[in-house]
């Protein structure tokens, strides 16, 4: 079994299959899995427990939500008990790879997948080492867990693209305390046009500050679509009194997903996993939990099925059932909210939506933003979700 991509999806699948005695080779183009750790990495507490993640991959816990904007408005929801964690993304990847090794799997880094061909009984995958030397791997199955780049699957049509930049900051303990134990989002066209910003606490004295924007072409909005993210992040630093912070790391990344997830999940013995089959959610940019969930669904099918077409049908059906009807609705809300968020009229529309949340509990906000339980809004939200307001 060849798994291309040692992110949360590929690493978790490798861990599960190696634990069942499967001969697994997990490869990644990165020479070091602690590098390029772009992920806001917030996760609800129940998911941490479900995946059996250890304390070593948890950077901090949170129990509150803070939404700042549009403008200077600020809303806060707090729980007496922890609601979730912020993961150390690099530590998570390293731990999953070590789990794979511990169960007898192999992990090889610095290998980029170039293509594959069908051979008797399986596939021959062509890879290239960082020094340019070619490598060929023969396997019964190949899983493309290479993320939004879809190294082997290739791109489906109608992808919605989100671009993000994140800085890891070193701040004074007093500054860190202001953001501790809460997830903060910055909303509105004066904060991040056609997107949003965030401040997440890491270990004491460290914060993640980031911005993300959707850039699907929109008629009459090219100036917003092409605006670089760097100035927005600098603006956040200044407005949040963080411009004196030390910058420990700078990284960026893409989310590219189809809202309806109606895309090929594989070809023959090549199967897509995680972000490669649009499991990254466009509303809040969440990808880790959904990527790992897709691995949990695929692993038993790879153990049970021998027929590629039947496996792929079952896999796609189970993924669709797992995400449910709320998933495409969350994508529509993301496109409706972020792409339109470029003027005061859009800010006012968002303000009305947020006002409806003020009587909610912190757990209700988690249910909305992590589980997409839009029905808690009631009928008053439907016109907004459907684009009538």
What are these regions (language model features)?
Residues 30-54:
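Conserved N-terminal glycine-rich FAD pyrophosphate-binding loop of Rossmann-like flavoproteins
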Residues 4-6, 15-38:
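Glycine-rich FAD pyrophosphate-binding loop
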Residues 6, 16, 20, 99-244:
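Predominantly flavin-linked oxidoreductase catalytic cores and closely associated redox partners
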Residues 10-11:
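N-terminal Rossmann-fold NAD(P) dinucleotide-binding loop
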Residues 215-301, 307-309:
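FAD/FMN-dependent oxidoreductases across multiple families
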Residues 300-389:
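C-terminal helical "tail/cap" subdomain of flavin- and related membrane-associated enzymes
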Residues 93-94, 109-111, 249-251:
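Short loop/edge segments at beta-strand edges and connector loops
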Residues 45-97:
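A conserved beta-strand/loop capping segment in the N-terminal third of enzymes
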